Amino acid sequence: MTSVGRIGARGAQFAALAVVVAVSVHNVLGQSVTADTSVARVGDYVERYYARAQSIIVDENVAIQPLALDLRHDGFARRLTYELRVEWNPDAPDDDGPAKVTRQLIAINGRPPKPDQEPECLDPRSTSPEPLAFLLPDRREKFIFKAAGLSRINGRTAMMIDYRSVKPEEPKVEWRDECVSIDLPGRARGRIWADPETSEILRLDEGIIGLVDITVPRKQQRPGGSTYMTIERADSSIRYRRVAFTDPDETLVLPASIDTTTIVKNSGSPRTRISQTFTNYRRFVTGSRIVQ
């Protein structure tokens, strides 16, 4: 029975210029705000964010929860704890993302992992792309951005920017025994909430455009089972919060939680919700000065 390990809706390679739909809104100061200026400011913020985040470690708590047809919990969740950090290399080549998340497994269902214990299909990868990297100045070409007005997030005014991929590309499918990881480049659609004055990102929601059929190789097919899987839904929502640090004193807006819901017809894990929460942020000091 095939289990879907990871579904992503962005491609791996991006070039230089963003495609922008320049629809004007007004910020809280009454100044005109267009998508092109907003996206440029947010992209600059993401660069500064990565420069700071690379000196931070956080505990990531993951709950992998099977869901019933009505999307209620179905059985027990698998719970994992990781120590997580961001690696930032602005000079990375196009085929190797400049920002990555690296994980060290600390516990499985509250117990230390065994030395030879292999990860299960739905467990997070030890290394994965950082989700804001597509907003960097040289990584936006395959997206269209559109200003979507103002809103409020946790009492803060937020400008909203909608985005979607320019055109779909061929799915990238990687099989490992009965596990499969799927990237769906060119099928992303989403919304960014950002502070109109500081460009701090407060929330990021993303899903896929349309349904996607994935052929199941004969080796992975169940007896009498389907020859394909259909990805019907792959939605994620990232929420951010302010975190205060000392020595030196600094407040950063960092991830608080990520919730991901996937529905994959004809798979071994047809409905799953993965919840990630981030606690115990702490900074490790290197010989380099923290970039302002």
Model-derived regions, located:
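Bacterial N-terminal signal peptides that target proteins for export
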Residues: M1-A16
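A general, composition-driven signal for non-globular sequence regions
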Residues: V4-I7, V20-V21, A35
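Bacterial N-terminal signal peptides
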Residues: A12-N27
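Structured extracytoplasmic
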Residues: L29-R189, P196-R203, G207-Q292
